[in-house]
From Swiss-Prot:
InterPro entries: Ribosomal_bL19 (IPR001857), Ribosomal_bL19_CS (IPR018257), Ribosomal_bL19_sf (IPR038657), Translation_prot_SH3-like_sf (IPR008991)
Functional description taken from the UniProt entry: This protein is located at the 30S-50S ribosomal subunit interface and may play a role in the structure and function of the aminoacyl-tRNA binding site.
Gene3D superfamilies attached to this UniProt entry: 2.30.30.790
Alphabetical GO biological process terms: translation
Record protein name field: Large ribosomal subunit protein bL19
Annotated keywords: Ribonucleoprotein, Ribosomal protein
Organism annotation: Chromobacterium violaceum (strain ATCC 12472 / DSM 30191 / JCM 1249 / CCUG 213 / NBRC 12614 / NCIMB 9131 / NCTC 9757 / MK)
Gene that encodes the chain: rplS
A GO CC term assigned to this protein in UniProt: cytosolic large ribosomal subunit
Lineage, opening ranks: Bacteria, Pseudomonadati, Pseudomonadota, Betaproteobacteria, Neisseriales
Molecular function via GO: structural constituent of ribosome
Amino acid sequence: MDLIQKLEQEEIARLGKTLPEFAPGDTVVVQVKVKEGNRERLQAYEGVVIAKRNRGLNSAFTVRKMSAGEGVERTFQTYSPLVASVEVKRRGDVRRAKLYYLRGRTGKSARIKEKLPARKQG
């Protein structure tokens, strides 16, 4: 491990940010800190994770939602101080790492099958 990677690992440890495990296809609610004038509030952004980029301190994920019939995508830096929390609403069952094909789809064709928990063998 070179010096830059060590520094990034130390910075991640110093931030101490714990986010739940999520993957592309999952529906998440991201609480974002928004500054309006002199006050700060949390804004919820709910959508489907269409991409995840794992690059240590530079990790990011992209969330897509439908707003007034229009698709809206937003990319969040995983270790950003503006991301207050991430909550997983439902797990999606997909076979791709990047779900960019959802950009061209709306309605029923844009639905993602839910991943059900594994049944216990007994």
